[in-house]
Every structure is written in C-alpha cells, then in structure tokens.
C-alpha cells in the first residue's frame, strides 16, 4: 500500500489521480490532500477519500474548512509553508503527486525530492525554473522521479531502461537515440486566421479540441507556451542537446510523443487523450494498473497528421526555445512573465497576442544573474513578476 500526498488535489490532475486511486483501492491510500483555497471542493474530497491531512495554502480557507469538516472524520487541517513541507517529507508518505500549477509548486516539490520520495512530476515549472538544482537534488537524495506530463511520460515509455533509470543524467547518444520528437496538438487556434488571434477571448482559448485542462494550462496550449515549457522540461529530464529535441504539431493528440533511434527506428506511445493513463503509469511503474481509460480503437482513429510549428502563429514557442538555449536564468524569467501575462489575459486586462509581447519584453529586459540556490531562483522570479506587471500597465 502506497501512501500518497496530492499537491493540487482540487485541480484536473488531482481529480484524475484520485480517480486512479479509487480504481485501485487496495494499492494506494490518500495520506494528504493539498489545495489553495477551494473549500467546497476540498470538503467533498475529504469526505470521499478520508485523508490524514488536508492542507490549505490560504489561511482563511483552512479556517473555513475546519469549521465545516465533520469531526468524526478525524482529519488534520493545516496551513502555512512549514506544515506543507512537513507533509511532503513525512516518514509515512511514499509518493508525492506534484500537480500544483506554476511557480507555487516549486518549493514543496523540491523538498519532496530532497526527502527521497517517489515524486510524480506534473508541475513542469519545477524544472523550468530550477532544472540543474532539481536534478542534482534528485541525484543526491536518491528520489525516484517520474514524469506525468503526457508527452514526457510518452517519451519515458519509449526509452530503454538504462535511460529511464538515469533521468537528468542519461546519455541519449550512447543509447542509440538520435532525436526526441515532442508532439503537440497546436491548440484551438491552429487553423485560425492570424488576423483574428488578437481578438480571441479567454473562453475561446480555454476550449481545447482534445484535452480537458485548467484555465492556465489551456491558455498556454493555445499560445503553445505549454509546449515551450515542455521543451525546456525535456531538456532537463532527458539531458538533451538542442539538436536532439524537435517539436511536431500533431492535431489528433493520438501519438503523445516519439523517440527516434540511430538505426532509423521510431518508437511512439499512443493512446486516448486522458491524463489518467500517464498518471496510472507513474503510480505503478514499473508495473501496470487499471487507469479507467478505454484503449485506443485504431478503426476509429482515422488520419494522423503532422506539421512543423509555425513560429509566426506561435511566438511563445519560439521564445521558450530561445530561453532554453540561453540557460536557466532565461527560462526562470520567461516562466514568471508568462504566469503574469496569462493571468492578465484571463482577467481581460490584455489581448491574446499581447501575452507574447509581455514575455518577450521580460526576456529581453530583466537582468539575468547566476543562480546557485533556490533563494536566487525565487528572487529572480519575484523581480520578473514586478517588471511584467509594469509592462502590463504600459500596454493595457
């Protein structure tokens, strides 16, 4: 029986994880649930899954949850960073699902790694912001790191065992691998006239053709910044050089990514677009469990198509690839700027195409300095957010 803590329990990844746990009740136990401020959702999850600990990032939300949670459930409600870090490093905890969206997930995810936990990584920003520090912490602690993102999980499944066992430190060329092919659907605006993009609304941007996701990730998919962040994440997970990584537009989201070998072979991971599949794979690795996802019906798939990315349509993807080439400081800046820009777009403060403008302004202007600690990373993140907000004020 694995005791699990779910960071981001009330989000889409959290819901999918709990669904897989419910389908395999004799193998997994919910030890802790972590959410920001969604009291009603957390209450329902506590009643359904009966964790030992329910942690609310928002103090007022924690107080509300304590007031409405039935005492008979005997669930400890906590709040504050110290309690959160104590939860993810607790001796009773075996596995941590890291699914808090954005920079907010970095510190607890890194602490779980330092504690040597089995970490299921759905928070891509942890590697985007602190790739080298994160990988080094994994190496020192002996933590097991498994990628949950559908693309990185697909790549992982297509790799030989010696690479799987050495994430972040592997040598792809030595294992006969020539390229990693990172697929992306192109989002809801793949076929839209370029002239119409500036007027696209948050509701339109969040209407993904294949996947069900939260608002921030949905907008990132529409700009293809999501693929850009995944490009950066893949660089750290698989220790790649720039020339070993390629982005492929694949609108059907049937092939979740591919690995090309020196001999000309290409191994692809396929399946219906449902996050329960990669989640179940990570939870059970190296075994397999039931995910609740219907297997792919090849007779209904139809045509599979592939295209090169259009950087005029997707400038955020180009910015992410450029930042990846520049290094860790640039990717930290880009991630912080993008979080501010996307939130502003969702609130109606800026237009869709202005997201890329904010990101580019920050990437060009914010001073980059060497980062040797988590404190350095968080300081650069905070500085970038200040500049991004100033940029918003100038273009709004």
Curated annotation (Swiss-Prot):
Q: Which cofactor does it need?
A: Mg(2+); Mn(2+)
Residues at which Mn(2+) binds: 149, 151, 230
Keyword set includes Lyase: no
Positions annotated to bind 1-deoxy-D-xylulose 5-phosphate: 124, 150-151, 185, 208, 221, 226-227, 230
Q: Which InterPro entries match?
A: DXP_reductoisomerase (IPR003821), DXP_reductoisomerase_C (IPR013644), DXP_reductoisomerase_N (IPR013512), DXPR_C (IPR026877), DXPR_C_sf (IPR036169), NAD(P)-bd_dom_sf (IPR036291)
Stated family: Belongs to the DXR family.
Function of the protein: Catalyzes the NADPH-dependent rearrangement and reduction of 1-deoxy-D-xylulose-5-phosphate (DXP) to 2-C-methyl-D-erythritol 4-phosphate (MEP).
Q: Which HAMAP family match?
A: DXP_reductoisom (MF_00183)
Q: What is this protein called?
A: 1-deoxy-D-xylulose 5-phosphate reductoisomerase
* Organism listed in the record: Shewanella baltica (strain OS195)
Name the lineage: Bacteria, Pseudomonadati, Pseudomonadota, Gammaproteobacteria, Alteromonadales
Q: Which gene encodes it?
A: dxr
